[in-house]
């Protein structure tokens, strides 16, 4: 069912952050930092994949995503909804259902047998495709999915995510340079504000998280493992 009411962006961001905290998808651990895929340390970690196990929350968030897209991209802006393998697939299916549109998904790489395709489902030349993912940090993985979509002759000018880190200033520019507009529901700053309001974390932890969010590169550089070759 297509949504017909449009909550303010600030309220969507606040409620999204609250739900992520409620299901304990948010983790703050400044004393024992997590290791990101890049190998760099981070005091924060978020697991949006948990959302699929909470029907009321996932339904509300998909309503939020649908109204965000209708308001910001247009009511007739898309012909196909594509999920990025693998975390984006369930969310793409839920958004496609709400918007009454076909759904496909994009592999990270060809599976190496059969059709050896990156696109699964029916995507045709000229279709306007929305890419759906669970989150984005610097936007890099989104561009690979967008390129795979465009190789079919379809267009892809928009990507929607539940969570956007919002701390790496180059992200939006990288996507825009590729002709892609990002539509997130909330960022780390929204989560930090809601975490403060909830009282779920101590002041020292929140201060360290804010230090990281304000200048992630410096925070990471100060905590990177020493290069053993430099002592030789």
Curated annotation (Swiss-Prot):
It catalyses: orotidine 5'-phosphate + diphosphate = orotate + 5-phospho-alpha-D-ribose 1-diphosphate. Orotate binds at residue 137. Keywords: Glycosyltransferase, Magnesium, Pyrimidine biosynthesis, Transferase. The keyword Transferase applies. Homodimer. Belongs to the purine/pyrimidine phosphoribosyltransferase family. PyrE subfamily. This is Orotate phosphoribosyltransferase.
């Amino acid at each position: 069912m297509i949504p017909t009411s449009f909550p303010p962006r600030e309220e969507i961001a606040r409620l999204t952050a609250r739900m992520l905290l409620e299901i304990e998808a948010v983790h703050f651990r400044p004393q024992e930092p997590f290791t990101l895929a890049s190998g760099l340390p981070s005091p924060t970690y978020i697991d949006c994949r948990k959302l699929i196990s909470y029907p009321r929350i996932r339904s509300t968030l998909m309503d939020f995503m649908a109204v965000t897209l209708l308001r910001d991209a247009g009511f007739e802006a898309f012909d196909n909804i594509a999920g990025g393998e693998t975390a984006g697939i369930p969310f793409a299916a839920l958004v496609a259902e709400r918007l009454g549109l076909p759904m496909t998904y994009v592999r990270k790489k060809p599976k190496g047998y059969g059709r050896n395709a990156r696109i699964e489902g029916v995507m045709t030349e000229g279709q306007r495709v929305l890419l759906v993912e669970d989150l984005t940090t610097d936007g890099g993985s989104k561009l690979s999915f967008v390129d795979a979509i465009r190789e079919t002759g379809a267009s892809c000018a928009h990507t929607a995510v539940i969570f956007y880190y919002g701390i790496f200033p180059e992200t939006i520019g990288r996507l825009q340079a590729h002709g892609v507009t990002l539509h997130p529901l909330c960022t780390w700053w929204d989560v930090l504000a809601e975490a403060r309001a909830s009282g779920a974390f101590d002041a020292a932890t929140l201060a360290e998280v804010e230090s990281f969010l304000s200048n992630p590169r410096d925070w990471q550089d100060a905590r990177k493992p020493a290069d053993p070759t430099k002592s030789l």
